[in-house]
């Protein structure tokens, strides 16, 4: 039998450790971060009891963020023509974001959803088909919400339950109702509004969107920012936006549920 020297054992253990680094998404991401990358400054665990509804554009309160802290959120994806470019830009700057996804797009593009999760982003919920829920019956609205949640959790975890793995939700068009807000609070699902947005649903160039969102961000001095990863101009301007955050001294905060996910 071949004897093993201490040096050979160490070499083998070193190789195993290197393989672990290669196969672990989080470790791989850290290894690839540039020294001058924007990065994610901290992680904020959101408590549904303390902050059941956040975003000053819709609600009285927002997340407990410091001056020049931002939370990046993207709605309506995943979409093959644009979401990969958004993910590439975030990965290049080692930034984590939150994606409020549509169940219909999740079913059509499951690999993109899996990529969002594997790269460390928070995957949250935005209904099945983007219906404005204040224009339909309470039962139909709840079914629209639950169908979207089920699509996400089935793709990512192989099953779904009444409470989503990530209990974050945003109403399409911010079209909520008191009854739906109460139902979501009862289920301990945090409802996200926004503190500002890029207005990227309007036709504009990437440069125009960049100027607009930076102006609003400077005026607000931080907050929850709403983009759409389905918009080409947003995907195109995002690298410059992230670099501008770095230059202007903004810091990115990554939001996660306070209660650990139970897939």
Residue ranges and their predicted role:
Residues 2-15:
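Bacterial N-terminal signal peptides that target proteins for export
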Residues 16-25:
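Bacterial N-terminal signal peptides
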Residues 27-35:
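Boundary at the C-terminal end of the N-terminal hydrophobic targeting segment
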Residues 38-140, 144-157, 164-166, 231, ...:
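Active-site beta->alpha N-cap acidic-glycine motif
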Residues 82, 131-158, 175-221, 234-237:
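Alpha-helical scaffold elements lining the catalytic groove of polysaccharide deacetylases
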Residues 195-196, 228-229, 256-257:
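Short secondary-structure boundary segments
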């Amino acid at each position: 039998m071949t004897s093993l020297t201490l040096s050979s054992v160490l070499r083998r253990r070193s190789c195993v450790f290197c393989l672990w680094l290669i196969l672990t998404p989080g470790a791989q991401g850290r290894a690839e971060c540039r020294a001058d990358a924007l990065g994610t400054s901290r992680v904020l665990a959101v408590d549904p009891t303390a902050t059941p509804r956040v975003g000053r554009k819709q609600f009285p309160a927002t997340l407990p963020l410091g001056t020049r802290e931002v939370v990046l959120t993207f709605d309506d994806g995943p979409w093959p023509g644009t979401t990969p470019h958004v993910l590439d830009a975030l990965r290049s700057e080692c930034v984590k974001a939150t994606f409020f996804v549509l169940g219909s797009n999740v079913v059509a593009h499951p690999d993109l959803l899996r990529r969002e999760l594997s790269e460390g982003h928070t995957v949250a919920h935005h209904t099945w088909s983007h219906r404005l829920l204040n224009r339909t019956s309470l039962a139909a609205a709840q079914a629209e919400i639950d169908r979207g949640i089920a699509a996400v959790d089935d793709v990512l975890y192989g099953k779904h339950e009444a409470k989503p793995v990530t209990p974050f939700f945003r109403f399409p068009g911010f079209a909520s109702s008191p009854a739906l807000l109460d139902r979501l609070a009862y289920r301990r699902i945090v409802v996200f509004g926004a503190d500002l947005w890029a207005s990227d649903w309007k036709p504009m160039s990437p440069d125009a969107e960049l100027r607009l969102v930076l102006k609003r961000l400077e005026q607000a001095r931080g907050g929850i920012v709403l983009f759409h990863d389905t918009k080409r101009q947003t995907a195109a301007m995002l690298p410059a936006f992230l670099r501008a955050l770095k230059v202007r001294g903004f810091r990115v905060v990554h939001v996660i549920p306070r209660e650990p996910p139970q897939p």
